[in-house]
Regions:
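Active-site recognition of the HExxH zinc-binding catalytic motif
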Residues: 48-60
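Metalloprotease/metallohydrolase-associated module, dominated by Zn2+-dependent proteases
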Residues: 1-45, 61-107
Length: 107
């Protein structure tokens, strides 16, 4: 998948809550241009997690989380990414015609 100039691949992984001491559903790994997603996710959790990590990739590739940027604090980045993801998905789900309009623009 292309995000800006980067090609990002998806990697569906087994979660390791004990090893990682984390309950995150996904993670953008910038150095490897990779998004890891827990492979047992389905439905809305999968959709939300994929878009959430894509937005993290956009934030990183836009330098918004670099020194001096508005999202240098990880907590702020997570709050912004989570809010944008949830609102954007709501817009798409409540307005399915919008997806069709966006697909027409790209063809």
């Amino acid at each position: 998948m292309k995000v800006g100039w980067n090609t990002i691949r998806f990697n569906f992984v087994d979660p390791s809550f004990i090893k990682d001491n984390s309950d995150c559903f996904g993670e953008y790994v910038s150095r490897e241009c990779r998004i890891d997603i827990q492979k047992e996710l389905i439905g809305d959790q999968l959709i939300n997690t994929v878009l959430h990590e894509i937005i993290h990739a956009i934030v990183y590739n836009s330098s918004l989380n670099q020194d001096g940027g508005p999202l240098t604090d990880d907590k702020h980045e997570e709050q912004v990414v989570n809010s944008i993801t949830n609102w954007l998905l709501n817009v798409f789900w409540e307005n399915p015609w919008l997806i069709e309009l966006l697909k027409k623009r790209s063809s």
